[in-house]
Amino acid sequence: MTLSFTARWRDELPATYTALLPTLLKNARLIWYNDKLAQQLAIPASLFDVTNGAGVWGGETLLPGMSPVAQVYSGHQFGVWAGQLGDGRGILLGEQLLADGSTLDWHLKGAGLTPYSRMGDGRAVLRSTIRESLASEAMHYLGIPTTRALSIVASDTPVQRETQETGAMLMRLAQSHMRFGHFEHFYYRREPEKVQQLADFAIRHYWPQWQDVPEKYVLWFEEVAARTGRLIVEWQTVGFSHGVMNTDNMSILGLTIDYGPFGFLDDYDPGFIGNHSDHQGRYRFDNQPSVALWNLQRLAQTLTPFIEIDALNRALDRYQDALLTHYGQRMRQKLGFFTEQKDDNVLLNELFSLMAREGSDYSRTFRMLSHTEQQSASSPLRDTFIDRAAFDAWFDRYRARLRTEAVDDALRQQQMQRVNPAVVLRNWLAQRAIDAAEQGDMAELHWLHEVLRQPFTDRDDDYASRPPEWGKRLEVSCSS
């Protein structure tokens, strides 16, 4: 089957990009590709059979229909207007036409200098490329909207970060790379007609059912707000900290995008800061819902030339509604509740308080709770707490709450184990794969990808265990 590509972004939004080709890496070689995703997209296996160079995966060749561009956008970074940003090292190669008529961006990250590189070198390093591939695939298999990773190319090109590393490229796929920052760019350039063109493009291609509706812009922004709310809930309930929620890292489609200093909670710490460059804690774990609303308000501001302010404020309420409604639903599922009762939040917050005091492992606590039997007065989870009396008191109230519903253990446990993962991408697991890959051993990288495809399957190895002490102290920054 021949892959078919189009260039809708290039053809319809000429003010938003610069056309250019990737800059090649030295001794580029394909070290991993996503076989399952490739099969789903009917990508010929022959494209991955690269024995001399890295082919399209290293930007050495283009497939028919590809028209590479680097996109321009702006944004607020750490709450401050940063001006023009853009794809400083990534190139949108083209948009794959799928059988259902939709498209999928092929975006090559680490593809070299662009007009938007500012002080950067246009490169991505092997370390950050591996982290993004693992994170995006982990999130996908957790059921969380995200970009996807299709391939990784390593090289011998030296790249200077805190230390000297080697350059790499990631082929990232997404339904769209449209960001809040695209709208901010033209709003602050006082070009409202181009802001409206972006909105028209989004509606035409992603919400075509509203094209001819008079209130199409309001409906569209309401949906952007609601999707953002649901995404943040998924992050919070699985214990994911993005680390750098700048407006240019926010997706119009409600996707998790731009994996940098991310982290999954180990010990439950609501104030967890994954990014050691975030000195003020703006993007700490428990502040993500507030930051997302702030970012939506910045996006709303760009839409004021063609949407009434009252309508924008009502749309922003959709974010809060989606956040609260979806959070309640998801946390009840995590606790094994099938109905909503007035004291559920009290019970949940008591558990969180106990976990915070004890430094309980976030994922393991909920996973172990999912094995609870109503008739059993004890739980293996009890042994993980120092204050057994406090846990016993909470557990008695929890079991009493379970007994208010006529649901047997098997059905409840099944529900809980579908939303409480046994495996998440802990930073130390990613680092172990990176360390091996930097020595030329890709086995752990490949195996970890396999493990992350089954996050809801119980395991008795270290992929599902608490991290070693050194693994809790890993520092992650925006450097990539």
Swiss-Prot record:
Binding site for Mg(2+): 249, 258
GO MF annotation: an example: ATP binding
Enzyme class: transferase
Amino acids binding ATP: 86, 88-89, 109, 121-122, 172, 179, 258
InterPro entries: adnlytase_SelO, SelO
Record: active site: 248
Cofactor(s) essential for the protein: Mg(2+); Mn(2+)
EC number: 2.7.7.-, 2.7.7.108
Keywords: ATP-binding, Magnesium, Manganese, Metal-binding, Nucleotide-binding, Nucleotidyltransferase, Transferase
Function (record text): Nucleotidyltransferase involved in the post-translational modification of proteins. It can catalyze the addition of adenosine monophosphate (AMP) or uridine monophosphate (UMP) to a protein, resulting in modifications known as AMPylation and UMPylation.
HAMAP family: YdiU_SelO
The protein's name in its UniProt record: Protein nucleotidyltransferase YdiU
